[in-house]
């Protein structure tokens, strides 16, 4: 009877051992599956840190300095000159906008600001020219006034026909002749001052009178 109990006990132990081995194998299989799934998972994408305005500006400056240090060919020099010219034209345009921006405070006869006033008729353009000229005449004492008008004429007459430009040229010629006539007659703004001849000092008579004195006159 004891042998039978021992046999049953050994059988029960072996069955438990087999169950434990099966459970351990299943657990190991699940761990391996999870490990494989983790490996095939896509790695997380790196987070792109957004630059601040200051950092972006600094980065742009560094790239520009690096570009300037590199040797330039003829084509690069041409592009650089073209870029400078475009920047200058943009600067001139901005200056013109700033110059005429003050006109918005003045109103036309219709009561609307001059910046929104769109002249259509000849009378409208006459009124518009008067307002613009009144504004520009505030700067006629500047030494850059004539240079400003040369630059202004090149820009505002770019789309004017040759015949109209010829009429404008005739108007300028009339103004020049009137200005010359006024300057010659002394009525112009720049009057020619008459030069006063320096006074001559006549020492001849004084020296002659001095020679007429005799040494005895001082005795």
Swiss-Prot record:
GO terms for molecular function: translation initiation factor activity. Its main location: cytoplasm. Keywords: Coiled coil, Cytoplasm, Initiation factor, Protein biosynthesis. InterPro entries: eIF3-like_dom_sf, eIF3j. Residues 22-40 have a biased composition (Acidic residues). GO terms for biological process: formation of cytoplasmic translation initiation complex. Residues 48-100 form a coiled coil. GO terms for cellular component: eukaryotic 43S preinitiation complex; eukaryotic 48S preinitiation complex; eukaryotic translation initiation factor 3 complex. It is found in: Cytoplasm. Pfam families: eIF3_subunit. Residues 22-47 are annotated as: Disordered. Component of the eukaryotic translation initiation factor 3 (eIF-3) complex, which is involved in protein synthesis of a specialized repertoire of mRNAs and, together with other initiation factors, stimulates binding of mRNA and methionyl-tRNAi to the 40S ribosome. The eIF-3 complex specifically targets and initiates translation of a subset of mRNAs involved in cell proliferation. Belongs to the eIF-3 subunit J family. Component of the eukaryotic translation initiation factor 3 (eIF-3) complex. This is Eukaryotic translation initiation factor 3 subunit J. It comes from Dictyostelium discoideum.
């Amino acid at each position: 009877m004891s042998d039978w109990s021992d046999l049953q006990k050994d059988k029960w132990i072996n069955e438990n051992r087999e169950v434990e081995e099966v459970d351990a194998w299943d657990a190991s299989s699940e761990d391996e599956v999870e490990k494989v799934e983790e490996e095939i998972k896509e790695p997380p994408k790196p987070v792109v840190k957004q630059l601040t305005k200051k950092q972006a500006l600094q980065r742009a400056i560094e790239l520009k300095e690096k570009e300037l240090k590199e040797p330039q060919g003829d084509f690069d020099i041409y592009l650089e000159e073209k870029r400078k010219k475009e920047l200058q034209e943009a600067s001139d345009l901005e200056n013109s906008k700033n110059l005429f921006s003050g006109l918005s405070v003045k109103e036309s006869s219709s009561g609307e600001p001059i910046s929104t006033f769109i002249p259509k008729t000849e009378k409208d353009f006459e009124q518009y020219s008067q307002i613009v000229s009144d504004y520009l005449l505030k700067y006629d004492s500047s030494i850059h006034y004539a240079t400003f008008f040369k630059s202004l004429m090149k820009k505002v007459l770019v789309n004017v026909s040759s015949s109209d430009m010829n009429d404008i040229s005739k108007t300028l010629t009339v103004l020049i002749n009137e200005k010359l006539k006024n300057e010659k007659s002394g009525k112009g703004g720049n009057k020619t001052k008459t030069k006063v001849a320096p006074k001559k000092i006549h020492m001849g008579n004084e020296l002659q009178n001095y020679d007429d004195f005799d040494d005895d006159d001082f005795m």
